[in-house]
């Protein structure tokens, strides 16, 4: 089958990073981020448009300056379990930290979601960006990069091993023979590694898709390496056309170097299309959004999040950007380094850095339905992504994309007209993962 575009929906409730004014939008309920009906409604819309997945991001540290959605939101797997009962094909991808969760708990929770959804679960593996998270888990300091990413790799390996505890035909449930489970097809893990000692087995069988799909949002060097080693889906940062192409080429090269098939990893860039009947109407809408979000104090606070939730309000705004590189040593290092490089290279003050940090270039996917479809197709065919992780301002902005752009992509033969599978893995075009113990048994029998 020819290559087709994949789409995910990323809801931000009352407003994520940079969306300072969204909670004031009269069309957005003030409790949207904790209203399960909000998520169910969006999930049904996404499924009606044949999207691949609903993606729920998460973090576990806040202060009062954080984005509105972050201040009051639902835990991802609880949320997705509820959504699962109202959908039948839409993938359900949740973010959980490998730094602050044990592999056995991760394996059990995601396997449970995979069963509840009948094979539509995905785990977005993160190592936790906010350094303050450590203090919510009894640690004085956030773990350093090498430790966090080493732990993340081992965590995924352990979790996947636990997901293979039962072979796919381990439960004959043969009443006549009195055999519920075949003990030869139940396997302990007995993992002993640098970060974890996990015996297993997991008390939960494999799902219709074998196991949940592993996602990762690799931006740093360590993140890209981890993504290349284990990810089956990657949430890429987006940016310009050239930046996206460079990231895509780099990550696909790394996947191949890791001995994996690059076509079996779906790369989705973050994107917020602005669609209206004409290009000019879309530009007006984009200007409205920019005006709604214009808030210097909030932009300054958002800048602080890139440096460990640092409070920049106590500095002289018109002095040179302060020396704060050390504050991002264990979290958000790549983004912080880019900010510092620009500040030093252009001799910017703190005020200028905050203003530049809040700048929004014109969205690459902006205009009439045909214009937006043209841009998406150009990026896709040029090797900038396999799909887009979409975020929209409100229901109207989502409806413009669903009702006008999706049909345009379908007419061009680049987006599905029906789901290919009942599972997330199947809709992403990923192969079914054979149970490692079944594979080992097959190899022994073939000798």
Where are these regions (language model features)?
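Alpha-helix-loop-beta-strand connector modules within alpha/beta enzyme cores
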Residues: 67-93, 256-258, 401-417
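Acidic (Asp/Glu)-rich catalytic clusters
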Residues: 2, 44-48, 80-88, 114-120, ...
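N-terminal beta1-alpha1-beta2 module of alpha/beta enzyme domains
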Residues: 1-86, 209-212, 440-447
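Hydrophobic faces of well-ordered beta-strands that scaffold small-molecule active sites
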Residues: 5-9, 54-56, 90-96, 119-125, ...
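Conserved, mostly hydrophobic/aromatic
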Residues: 7, 46, 50, 83, ...
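An alpha-helical appendage that flanks or caps ligand/catalytic pockets
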Residues: 1-18, 27, 146-209, 242-245, ...
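Active-site mouth loops of central-metabolism enzymes
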Residues: 22-37, 95-104, 140-142, 208-221, ...
